[in-house]
């Protein structure tokens, strides 16, 4: 129970009293990766997140750990090579949260990719990204392309490319990395905001003053080194330090829409051109839905809850109807949406899609380290780079020596399944185990596929007498209780949006079971009447934002 909600007070006591080799500000995938790398090397690590884990960018992506085909188009050869190799590592270390998915790349007359350039491009991609033989590209005829996805626009169709991307659950990837870091000894807590830095007599950062946003308690965490990994908020965090450099972020926004497959019966993931601006976007089937995205526009509005506008929705609806003309989807067919912010490093005069997704480390005179930019796929390598630097500074300043990076072959929480090749057999073995508990085969398969080697703990929860007193289906009940016991869920939206993904991909379950979920959480976490009222309102607001993102108030932070 290293990341249990019930351990919050114990964790806070340690954070108050101990001194850490490294304190990390930010609980998205970048911060989680740094916490795991540093704690695996033997550093004493603390991490604070002002919201819930992955509540910012790391739960709002296109949910792909991809090799960066789009970067080949921009001749960023090094990025393609690195992301391709990292993608394979991410998959191997956590096959329960990352799944290979064949992607169709339709080629139309006048489109981004012609037949020759697609063949050359995908061939280069295979070599640069180190794609395994079974997943290397295939070139398809027009007939073969339509056999893969009959909904694709026939007019001007010349054929298609077929290559493998990796689909992930970004928020669950983040929490599984975080849980493994906690198992390695990192002290990790959410809803804890950094307020300001503390300094020693040489004006070097030696700690962070924080506030617990659930209790309003204020305390200081002592640290030898501090890393700012706050994603879209890195400039806000740096503004409290006297020694910041002149570099800054440029935020861009990406919006996705979710449509039920009864309205958009997509059977195959597709990467395709839009008509309006030549951007390429994804349409991906998932859990009886199809999700489509993303947009790419500059953004300077509220960061904690980015706005989905009617213009964003119209752009994606038009894109769907352009590439899949027979479906004729309308705005009313959108079940839910999400918007995420990309924290990119500012480059003057560049359009949103032209700004590099590279990451950079900035070191201030105060000793504060900031990691900015980057992308989901590269989280492990980004962590390695910055922890290498932290290790170097700790040796120079304190004479401390730590082992080198060891995350390349380190399974994340739930990933102890015998490797990706064994994952399907592992799942079927767990389905057999579940039969002995009387758990439905389909439920058991979904749970084993989602939670990997942690699934036995969910099966055990299914045997408790409390379940029989609840009004929830077994699957939702065990996921909810597990997320409180093992994944530091405190508010209903932590579960509904990020641990389960239901707010995006099964909003009907949210509408049907939200009251029962709040009742169980209130009982387990001893909510006050005021908390019940506040958290119920937060759920209603999240539903409203998912269904009608354009109704959010246009206020600035």
From Swiss-Prot:
Keywords: Cytoplasm, FAD, Flavoprotein, Glycerol metabolism, Oxidoreductase. The keyword Cell inner membrane does not apply. The gene is glpD. One of its GO terms (cellular component) is cytoplasm. PROSITE patterns: FAD_G3PDH_1, FAD_G3PDH_2. Pathway: Polyol metabolism; glycerol degradation via glycerol kinase pathway; glycerone phosphate from sn-glycerol 3-phosphate (aerobic route): step 1/1. Its cofactor is FAD. The keyword Ligase does not apply. This is Aerobic glycerol-3-phosphate dehydrogenase. Its EC number is 1.1.5.3. It is an enzyme of class 1 (oxidoreductase). It comes from the Bacteria.
């Amino acid at each position: 129970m290293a990341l249990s909600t019930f351990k919050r007070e114990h964790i806070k006591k340690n954070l108050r009293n101990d001194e850490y080799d490294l304190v990390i500000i930010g609980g998205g995938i970048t911060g989680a990766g740094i916490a795991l790398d540093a704690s695996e090397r033997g550093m004493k690590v603390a991490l604070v997140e002002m919201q819930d884990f992955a509540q910012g960018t790391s739960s709002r992506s296109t949910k792909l750990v991809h090799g960066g085909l789009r970067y080949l188009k921009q001749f960023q050869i090094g990025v393609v090579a690195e992301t391709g190799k990292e993608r394979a590592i991410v998959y191997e270390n956590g096959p329960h949260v990352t799944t290979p998915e064949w992607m169709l790349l339709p080629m139309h007359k006048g489109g981004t990719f012609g037949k020759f350039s697609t063949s050359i491009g995908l061939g280069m991609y295979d070599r640069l990204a180190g794609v395994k033989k079974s997943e290397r590209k295939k070139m398809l005829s027009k007939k073969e392309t339509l056999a893969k996805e009959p909904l694709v626009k026939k007019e001007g169709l010349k054929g298609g490319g077929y290559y493998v991307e990796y689909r992930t659950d970004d928020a669950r990837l983040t929490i599984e990395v975080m849980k493994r870091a906690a198992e390695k000894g990192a002290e990790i807590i959410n809803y804890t905001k950094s307020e300001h830095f503390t300094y020693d007599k040489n004006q070097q950062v030696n700690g962070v003053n924080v506030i617990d946003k659930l209790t309003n308690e204020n305390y200081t965490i002592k640290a030898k080194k501090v890393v700012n990994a706050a994603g879209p908020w890195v400039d806000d965090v740096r503004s409290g330090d006297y020694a910041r450099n002149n570099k800054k972020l440029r935020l861009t926004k990406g919006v996705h829409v979710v449509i039920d497959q009864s309205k958009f019966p997509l059977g195959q993931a597709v990467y395709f051109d839009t008509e309006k601006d030549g951007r390429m976007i994804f349409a991906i089937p998932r859990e009886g839905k199809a999700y489509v995205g993303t947009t790419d526009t500059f953004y300077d509005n509220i960061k904690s809850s980015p706005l989905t506008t009617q213009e964003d929705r119209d752009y994606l609806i038009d894109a769907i109807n352009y590439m899949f003309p027979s479906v004729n989807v309308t705005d009313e067919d959108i079940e839910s949406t999400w918007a995420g912010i990309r924290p990119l490093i500012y480059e003057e005069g560049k359009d949103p899609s032209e700004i590099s997704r590279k990451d950079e480390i900035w070191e201030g005179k105060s000793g504060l380290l900031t990691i900015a930019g980057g992308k989901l796929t590269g989280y492990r390598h980004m962590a390695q780079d910055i922890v290498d630097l932290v290790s170097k500074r700790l040796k120079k300043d304190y004479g401390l020596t730590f082992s080198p990076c060891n995350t390349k072959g380190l399974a994340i929480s739930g990933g102890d399944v015998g490797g990706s090749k064994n994952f399907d057999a592992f799942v079927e073995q767990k389905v057999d185990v579940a039969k002995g508990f009387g758990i439905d085969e389909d439920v058991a398969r979904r749970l084993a596929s989602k939670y990997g080697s942690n699934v036995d703990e969910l099966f055990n929860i299914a045997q408790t007498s409390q379940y029989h007193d609840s009004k929830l289906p077994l699957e939702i009940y065990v996921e909810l209780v597990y997320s409180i016991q093992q994944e530091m869920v405190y508010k209903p939206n932590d579960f509904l949006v990020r641990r389960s993904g239901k707010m995006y991909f099964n909003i009907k379950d949210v509408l049907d079971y939200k009251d029962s979920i709040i009742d169980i959480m209130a009982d387990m976490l001893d909510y006050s009447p005021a908390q019940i009222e506040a958290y119920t309102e937060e759920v209603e607001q999240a539903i409203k934002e998912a269904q009608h993102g354009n109704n959010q108030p246009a206020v600035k932070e």
